[in-house]
Curated annotation (Swiss-Prot):
Belongs to the sodium channel (TC 1.A.1.10) family. SCN7A subfamily. It comes from the Eukaryota. The keyword Phosphoprotein applies. Its main location: membrane. It catalyses: Na(+)(in) = Na(+)(out). II repeats lie at residues 488-757. Disulfide bonds join C268-C308, C658-C664, C696-C705, C1087-C1107, C1451-C1466. This is Sodium channel protein type 7 subunit alpha. Disruption phenotype: Homozygous knockout mice are healthy, fertile, and apparently normal but display abnormal salt-intake behavior under water- and salt-depleted conditions without altered taste reception. The voluntary water intake normally induced by sodium concentration increase in body fluid is impaired. III repeats lie at residues 916-1224. The sodium channel formed by SCN7A is probably a heterooligomeric complex consisting of the ion conducting pore forming alpha subunit SCN7A and regulatory beta subunits such as SCN3B. Interacts with ATP1A1; activates ATP1A1 and thereby indirectly signals to nearby neurons to regulate sodium homeostasis.
Length: 1681
């Protein structure tokens, strides 16, 4: 972007100014418009922004008066003038008086402009809009409110009138109708007038339009306008992604129609009895009698009939019922695939992952479990790929916007930056001078204290954003010195010094931290029910902590004086905490008044001593301040949506409530009032919208509900995703080691002193037991040594030589804390005593993060080689490894050194020269060769897979398959023997030390132990539980496959540094859990009617005592909710369900119904408890999620940089394939098919390769997809016949295409995979159509023929055939596939392990809630289905709810399970909680990295310059266009035709107009007559497309030599100039002419004036004319540059 020239003065807009603008408009008609094409508006001078500082203060007479525009873009091109208000805000108006626009000098317009730009006018409109917005959210308003609404309407009409007069109706971009916001304002006002004063007021839609008035807040705030414009740019960038999403949505919807049309109507209908006359025709037919609801089979507590299917893996009906297609679809008929509309809604539901488990179960019941593959594919494409795509585009847009803002702030208005810098320097100098004067006036005794105060104050200011401080009056300074800086008697000074020593001592901070932690622990101990002893203990502890905090505050005030104390923000925070806690003691009778405030403050107080917490909070605060406009826009949108929904659907929810509930009682989720409408919108934005949409369609119809919900979902998610991207980007710069505050340093110092004291005591004890040399002891006792040995172990302390060596190192360097790697380098390695040769194990680089491989020297620069304890002829000898090699996990094996294993034998060991030594050596060499043989490794890998796979066979039916059970028992023993043998071989080959120093071998050893324990468990019945650990055998897969090793290493390296951030997030959750316990402990109990299973109404049972007095109370109906806040642990689990939006609705319902402890809940009694969950979702879920993901991305980028920019989740071999694939995809080189020499075949070749032919085929595919869209279930026979003939026509057309291509391409046809696919589609389609006609049976259903034809729709994604934007969006996925596949393998292994564990522990759990016939843990397939749901964070609350059944009232522990010896159907709550929580955390971590891989791959595409290789066809098309511009074959073209020639070329050589600036910048040689040679143009255009490097230079030389061969008679010429020089000459001539004209104008003005006094305004006009000339001159130069 071009910068504006030096700022000129503010010139009033006069008649002469208007004449100049009119003359300029007349001149522009005769000049070349491209001379001003490069002139762009300055972003610092945009309308709505403040005038920059370099323009100085506003002179008198310039405020609210028309001024000449200071931006050359608007002055030269847009013909505008500007107006400034008192706040220096820029307003721009059109100066041309056309289309009912008054002159800028008209008094009426000037008065309107003054009113429009006045801040009070803007404030009046803002207050009116806010008042109107508040009134709109209220219901049942009194009559006098109508007068206020009429007044507000009058204000809006007056505003429109003022704007029309000031701006004109339609005269340029700054007219009234030139602003879209004015269109909205005018429309809303017009409709409001119609509804207020016309008979049309009864129309609901006209009344609803008034709610758009809320959006009027946006144009009143420039920041909101900027955010809206940014989001509009994001939508432009997202256009391709939205189109791709709609394409996939349509394709999968059609696929769903073909697979599941009509299936959801299959229900279990009662079989007619023998005495009934009705008969059943067939299993899929209909009964002769009309089925009623009573005839269907319903599960206990189910609302809809049980679905079934006729496949063996589908749902089965109980005895006495048959599966028939009758009735309506489930969910009130809104869930189906019977037509394209409902199928599209179902696919959109899966795309947003809203309640997908219900749809899974419905489809699997009706169609079969095999269709779970369809949902896995849908989840990958929609929930993963498209989400990553949207996030990637938003991230790229945000990064570009941030980069542009940085460039503007760094490059624009340097004078402004210099002015600000000078002002800052003056302020600093004045403050320093004032400080020196104050110091001179003070007494010497107070200087030290004041310095401490200043030091603390400075420290506090460093932790806060710097703000400008205003100078205070002298009297105020005297008052401060007298009242807030205490100078009393010497006793007070001593007390001051004592308090200062106490509060600054490191142990004081450690003591405070311990007290805060204990205070938090005391808060976390509260639970329900709680004994009186514990309650009193917690109360006393709370009083003690309050006393400690109060003493701390008093000591700090004494030590620092009140003035210094309150200069630090943390001290102010501490004082507030103390005041609130003292208030809590005084108001102890008011329950929960101050607790909810003090509890968060205590947690925040702990964060004072944690640098990660402070850093994260600082980043969060700065980010939210920078994003305040975006947050405000999101709040406005939510408010608008709630009000709009309330106005649109409120009456329908009241009048048609009986359509939802049979008892006609109000629902929890509706839009009858603002609060419920707001919560409904909030629930929609949280991703749960389908259930409320069903209810909305029941009461208000589909026509309004679906558009409203789509608006809220799409716009709301766009705002949330953009906010998410910006916050994640901010946290990606987090560095925990960047700063350590004073309190943290004190804690480190205190811990170091404690460790030093403990070590000194240990040294004394050891010195009494051993005789330590005096010199060594003296050196150890040196303070520098004591300070740095605190982190060493007892074995290190016993090594005196280590201390001596460390003493020498520490004396030559600064006293810095010893890092872990440095401390390990100080440990003396044991001497090698093995005399026999051994083989080294795998490279230590594979030991995850084994830090024994190398150590850093004291200077930290060089790496030392570790001394090998042993070696072998067949061993892999580790060499010195660089950091880069370690990061990519590449290592080399050095060649065998003949004497590498020769070591001196120590006493008592086997000698190498002895006979036994040689035998042992040969045995070890043989074992080494065996274990390192590739065939042996493949055999072990195969055995590992077989061993892991057999675990899937041990389901609940294993006892019924006796043979399989026996085979598995023998297989377990065989596998155990093989792995034991392998371990023994490695022990012999590598030795124990090398074996157990490798973490992967440790894992193998653990698996062997698991094998042994499981085999032992089978021998005795009392040891049978040991067999349940067999699932750990699958962990051996990790050590056998390099891909999983790479992924696991990368996960560890990207996750471990986030531990501090994870702890911060955990503390936030602990805070919310403690608050939840304070709010809801013991309040979720309710009295249940055992006959109905529902809660008693509150007017029948009010509390626990009344419930227990009921006569039929035999089963204790006073029950607690399974998810509650009775203690911190339950609170964590409840918050996890809220965070995953699973089961959170029931938790919120219990919370808002809660009345009190031992009180019966009442419907929506505590409605405002919704705020607790809203705050948690924002501050406990959204923001911590941004923190974690941002830090993970930072670590991901760090590891990626260390590996040279390559992907960290792929192996070395895959990296080579990745580079090759990347070059292939970016090069976009396609091997052309040779054109046949036969004329007929050549004609067909030209036909099928023509673009029009490809377009026709794409249109045919789209038409064929349209024929599927118009179909529906139970359509008429005429429709069936029409569709059959349309399918036949499409098959014939596609067959004709296949024949034409076969004839044209010949054998080359089958070299393309796309052609092979088309050929197979044609064959299957013909077969599907002809078989029914020949044999009369449909072996291939007609719907399947349509789906086969539909598969051709993927041609739209074909590179070069479909839209290019689709190809660009698919590139990241293709490039990221290797990494995604590796990560998928790891997550599949995790799912496999957890599925086996679930089969062992939850196979016999009672089928209830989320566990049913389809989703259970009985078999491996069902377990994987359950875990797939949990992986997408859906449905795990229902499974956990079923596992919670562990009491006699909920399950039967003695139930006999047929076919097995296991009894009972109870679950284990503790095991279930651990199972699901651990799996959610692990799977979330892996999935987040999958998202990051794909997003980073997408972001890397624009950062790399796409160097495209031009093909022969590109050059052929170039010369084809050249022939049109050079028909005489002169090899030259006139320079005036160059622009048209560049615009006529085909991509990638194509250059769109305006392109003169780009062509001039190419600096093309020109011959006589302003002609340019063909070769020069070709070479320049090729270089523009392919870039500049050595490879391109070679290609250019080849092009030039090829051109010379093809044109041997090239005309030689000498270029006389270039395009750039010629343009510079023309611009220079124009500048000279304009300068001369300006000079002549000034001379004429001097001659005309007869008096020496010249009108000031005329001088301004003259300077304006000269400056305007300069602006135009600079604009012309900048245009060409």
């Amino acid at each position: 972007m071009l910068t504006s020239p030096e700022p000129k003065g503010l010139v009033p807009f006069t008649t002469e100014s208007l004449e100049l603008i009119e003359n300029h408009i007349a001149k522009k008609c005769n000049e070349d418009p491209e001379e001003e094409e490069g002139l762009k508006p300055s972003r610092n001078l945009e309308a709505g922004k403040r005038l920059p500082i370099p323009y100085g203060t506003l002179p008198r007479g310039t405020v609210s008066e028309p001024l000449e525009d200071v931006d050359p873009y608007y002055y030269v091109k847009r013909n505008t003038f500007m107006v400034l208000n008192r706040s220096r805000v820029i307003f721009r108006f059109n100066a041309v008086s056309i289309f009912c626009t008054l002159s800028p000098l008209n008094s009426l317009r000037r008065a309107a402009i003054k009113a429009l730009v006045h801040p009070l006018f803007r404030l009046l409109i803002l207050i009116s809009v806010l008042t109107d917005s508040i009134l709109m959210c209220m219901s049942n308003l009194p009559e006098w409110i109508l007068a206020i609404e009429n007044t507000l309407l009058g204000i809006y009409a007056f505003e429109i009138l003022v704007k029309v007069i000031a701006r004109g109706i339609w005269a340029g971009s700054f007219s009234f109708l030139g602003d879209l916001w004015n269109w909205l304002d005018f429309s809303v006002t017009l409709f409001e007038l119609i509804t207020r004063f016309s008979p049309l007021s009864s129309f609901l839609m006209l009344k609803t339009i008034r709610t758009f008035r809320i959006l009027k807040i946006i144009p009143l705030n420039h920041g909101l306008q900027s955010i809206v414009m940014t989001l509009a740019q994001c939508l432009k960038k997202l256009f391709g992604a939205i189109a791709l999403a709609l394409f996939f949505l349509a394709v999968f919807s059609l696929l769903g129609m073909g697979l599941f049309m009509g299936n959801l109507k299959h229900k279990c209908l009662r079989w007619p009895e023998e005495n009934e006359n009705e008969t059943l025709h067939n299993r899929t037919g209909s009964l002769n009698y009309s089925p009623e609801r009573i005839n269907f089979y319903y599960m206990e507590g189910a609302k809809y009939a049980l679905l079934c299917g006729n496949r063996t893996d589908a749902g089965q009906c109980p005895e006495g019922y048959v599966c028939v297609k009758e009735g309506t679809n489930p969910d009130n008929g809104f869930t189906s695939f019977d037509n394209f509309g409902w199928s599209l809604l179902a696919m959109f539901r899966l795309m947003t992952q809203d309640y997908p488990e219900l749809l899974y179960h419905q489809i699997l019941y009706a169609s079969g479990k095999v269709y779970m593959i369809f949902f896995v594919m849908i989840s990958f494409w929609f929930a993963f790929y498209l989400t990553s795509l949207f996030l990637g585009i938003l991230t790229m847009t945000y990064e570009k916007e941030k980069q542009r803002a940085c460039e503007e702030s760094g490059g624009l208005d340097p004078k402004c930056q210099q002015t600000v810098k000078e002002l800052d320097e003056e302020n600093d100098a004045a403050e320093m001078e004032t400080t020196q004067i104050e110091m001179k006036k003070r007494s010497p005794t107070s200087i030290n204290t004041t310095l401490d105060i200043l030091e603390d104050t400075t420290l506090g200011h460093r932790e806060e954003p710097e703000t400008s401080r205003k100078k205070c009056p002298i009297c105020w300074h005297k008052f401060i010195k007298t009242c807030f800086i205490w100078k009393c008697s010497p006793c007070w000074v001593k007390l001051n010094e004592f308090a200062d020593r106490v509060i600054t001592h490191p142990l004081a901070d450690l003591f405070l931290v311990i007290c805060i932690v204990l205070n938090i622990c005391f808060l976390a101990l509260e639970h329900f029910p709680m004994s009186e002893e514990l309650r009193s203990l917690l109360h006393v502890g709370n009083l003690v902590f309050i006393g400690i905090y109060t003493i701390e505050m008093i000591l700090k005030i004494i030590a620092m004086h009140p003035y210094g104390y309150f200069q630090i923000s943390w001290n102010i925070f501490d004082s507030i905490l103390v005041v609130l806690e003292l208030t809590e003691i005084l108001l102890a009778d008011v329950e929960g008044l101050a607790v909810l405030i003090t509890v968060p403050l205590i947690f925040i107080k702990l964060g004072k001593y944690g640098p990660p917490f402070k850093s994260l909070m600082r980043i969060l605060g700065s980010s939210l301040m920078a994003l305040k406009d975006l947050v405000l826009l999101l709040c406005i949108f939510v408010y608008f949506s709630a009000v709009f929904g309330m106005k649109l659907f409120g009456r329908s929810y009241k009048d048609c409530v009986c359509h939802i509930k049979e008892d006609c009682q109000p629902q929890r989720w509706h839009m009858s009032d603002f609060l419920h409408a707001y919560m409904t919108v909030f629930r929609i934005l949280c991703g749960e919208w389908i259930e409320t949409l069903w209810e909305c369609m029941e009461v208000a119809g589909q026509a309004w509900c679906i558009p409203f919900y789509m608006m809220v979902i799409l716009i709301g998610n766009l705002l949330i995703l953009y906010l998410f991207v910006t916050l994640v980007s901010s946290f990606s710069y987090y560095d925990a080691t960047s700063e350590v505050n004073k309190e943290a340093k004190n804690l480190q110092l205190a811990m170091a002193r404690i460790k030093s004291g403990i070590n000194s005591m240990l040294l004394k004890l050891m010195c009494t037991e051993r005789s330590v040399p005096t010199e060594a002891t003296d050196q150890i006792c040196d303070p520098s040594v004591k300070e740095n040995i605190s982190g060493h172990t007892l074995s290190e302390l016993s090594n005196t030589q280590t201390f001596l060596r460390y003493k020498d190192q520490s004396s030559s360097t600064e006293k810095t804390p010893v890092t872990e790697s440095e401390s390990q380098s100080l440990i003396a390695s044991p001497s090698a005593s093995e005399t026999v040769p051994i083989a080294s194990g795998e490279s230590d680089i594979e030991n995850l993060d084994n830090k024994e491989t190398r150590s850093k020297s004291g200077n930290g620069g060089s790496k030392e080689k570790m001394k090998q304890s042993s070696s072998s002829e067949c061993s892999t000898v580790d060499i010195a490894i660089s950091e880069e090699e370690e990061m990519v996990y590449e290592h080399e094996k050095s060649k065998l050194h003949k004497n590498g294993y020769e070591r001196k034998s120590s006493t008592g060991q086997i000698s190498r020269e002895s006979r036994n030594g040689k035998i042992w050596k040969n045995i070890r060499k043989t074992c080494c060769k065996i274990v390192e043989n590739s065939w042996f490794e493949c055999f072990i890998g195969l055995v590992t897979l077989l061993c892991t796979g057999t675990l899937a066979l041990e389901d609940i039916y294993i006892d019924q398959r006796k043979t399989t059970k026996i085979l598995l028992e023998y297989a377990d023993m065989i596998f155990a023997y093989i792995f034991i043998l392998e371990m023994l071989l490695k022990w012999v080959a590598y030795g124990f030390k090398a074996f157990f120093s490798n973490n992967w071998y440790k894992l193998d050893f653990m698996v062997v132990i698991v094998f042994c324990l499981s085999l032992i468990g089978k021998t005795r019945e009392d040891l049978n539980p040991l067999t349940s650990i067999k699932f750990l055998r699958a962990l051996r897969v990790l050590s056998q496959f390099e891909r999983m090793k790479v992924v696991l290493r990368a996960l560890i390296k990207t996750t471990l540094p986030t531990v501090s951030v994870f702890l911060v997030c955990l503390m936030i959750w602990l805070l919310f859990s403690v608050i939840g316990v304070q709010l809801f402990a013991g309040k979720f109990y309710e009295c249940i009617d055992p006959t109905k299973g529902e809660r008693f109404p509150v007017f029948e049972v009010m509390n626990k005592s009344q419930c227990e007095k009921l006569l039929f109370n035999e089963s204790m109906p006073w029950e607690n909710a399974k998810l509650n806040f009775d203690n911190v642990g339950n609170g964590f689990l409840s918050l996890l369900q809220v965070a995953t939006f699973n089961g959170w609705i029931s938790i919120m319902n219990s919370a808002i119904d809660s009345v009190g402890v031992n009180m019966q809940p009442s419907f929506e009694y505590n409605l405002y408890m919704y705020s607790y969950f809203i705050i948690f979702v924002i501050f406990g879920l959204f923001l911590p999620l941004c923190m974690l993901i941002g830090v993970i991305i930072r670590n991901f980028n760090k590891q990626k940089i260390k590996q040279g920019g390559s992907n960290i989740f792929i192996t070395v071999k895959q990296k080579k394939q990745y580079r090759a694939l990347k070059k292939l995809l970016y090069a976009d080189v396609q091997k052309p098919t040779p054109r046949p020499r036969n004329k007929f075949q050549g004609f067909l070749f030209d036909l099928v390769t023509h673009r029009v032919f490809n377009v026709i085929i794409i249109l045919l595919i789209c038409f064929q997809a349209t024929t599927i869209m118009i179909q529906k279930d139970e359509q008429s026979p005429q429709m069936e016949t029409a569709i059959f003939w349309m399918n036949s026509i499409f098959v014939m057309l596609f067959t004709l295409e296949c024949i034409l291509k076969l004839t044209a391409f010949r054998c080359h046809y089958f070299t393309s995979a796309w052609n092979v696919h088309d050929f197979m589609v044609v064959i299957f389609s013909i077969t599907g159509l002809l078989l029914p006609l020949t044999i009369g049976q449909y072996f291939v259903p007609p719907s399947l023929v349509q789906l086969i034809l539909l598969s051709r729709v993927i041609h739209i994604l074909r590179p070069g055939k479909g839209p290019k934007v689709f190809h660009d969006l698919m590139l990241p996925l293709i490039l990221a596939l290797p990494a995604l596949l590796n990560i998928s393998l790891l997550i599949f292994l995790v799912m496999f392990i957890y599925a086996i564990f679930g089969m062992y522990n939850f196979a016999y759990v009672k089928k209830e809630a989320g566990i049913n016939d389809v989703s259970n843990f009985e078999t491996f397939g069902s377990s994987m289905l359950c875990l797939f749901q949990v992986t997408t964070f859906s449905g795990w609350d229902g499974m956990l709810d079923a596992i919670f059944n562990s009491q006699w009232s909920d399950c039967d522990p003695d139930k006999i399970n047929p076919g097995t010896q296991v009894k009972g159907d109870c679950g284990s709550p503790s095991v279930g909680i651990s199972y699901f929580v651990s799996y959610i955390l692990i799977s979330w971590l892996i999935i987040v990295n999958m998202y990051i891989v794909l997003i980073m791959e997408f972001l890397s595409i624009p950062s790399q310059k796409k160097s495209r290789t031009l093909s022969e066809d590109d050059f052929r098309r170039f010369f084809r266009v050249w022939n049109r511009f050079d028909p005489d074959r002169t090899q030259y073209i006139d320079s005036s035709k160059l622009s048209d020639f560049a615009a006529a070329l085909d991509p990638p050589l194509f250059m769109a107009k305006p392109n003169k600036g780009q062509l001039v910048a190419m600096d093309l040689p020109m011959a006589a007559g302003d002609r340019i040679h063909c070769l020069d143009i070709l070479l320049a255009f090729t270089k523009r497309v392919m870039g500049k490097d050595e490879r391109v230079e070679k290609i250019l030389s080849e092009i030039e030599s090829g051109f010379m061969l093809a044109n041997p008679f090239k005309i030689t010429y000498e270029p006389i100039t270039t395009t750039l020089k010629r343009k510079q000459e023309a611009v220079s001539a124009t500048i000279i002419q304009r300068a001369y004209k300006s000079y002549r104008l000034r001379q004429n003005d001097k001659n005309v004036s007869d008096t020496p006094a010249i009108d000031d305004r005329r001088d301004d006009l003259t300077s304006k004319g000269a400056h305007s000339g300069k602006i135009e001159e600079k604009a012309s130069i900048q245009t060409q540059i």
